[in-house]
Amino acid sequence: MKILFVLISILYAVYCFSSEEDVDGAYLANELEPVEDINSEQYAALEPKEEQERSCAGMGQDCKDDCDCCLNIATCDCWFGRYFCSCTFGDYQTCLRKKGKCKRNRPQSCPRSNLNRKKG
């Protein structure tokens, strides 16, 4: 069964290479005309639109402080002090801090985890 599979694979590879050479040879001899797309003008962009700046940064994007990050619990984490800053996941305390400090992207509510609550 394996030998049959290898034999079929070799025959298929030879067929692909030989048919490709025929098409390339015919194209070089101008026997085939290049295909022209009649709808190419329809899909051409008239003017590239400029990307508008977002009001907040998503997870993993660059930031300057916690208020730049979109999520309520997202914090701006920096390497080496104030260099290479990006938004990462924070916690409930981060949300409370953002609620008091931020004027833009202020959290409306801070989600609490049900993991640490005592029942009873």
Curated annotation (Swiss-Prot):
An example Gene Ontology CC term for this record: extracellular region
Pro-peptide positions on chain: 17-54
Subcellular location: Secreted
Main location: secreted
Posttranslational mods: Contains 6 disulfide bonds.
Tissue: Expressed by the venom gland.
Cysteine disulfide links: C56-C70, C63-C76, C69-C87, C78-C85
Span of domain Agouti: 56-95
Keywords: Disulfide bond, Knottin, Secreted, Signal, Toxin
Record's signal peptide: 1-16
Domain of life of the source: Eukaryota
Keyword Signal attached: yes
Recorded family membership: Belongs to the neurotoxin 05 (agouti) family.
Comment field on protein domains: The presence of a 'disulfide through disulfide kOR' structurally defines this protein as a knottin.
Name of the featured protein: U13-lycotoxin-Ls1b
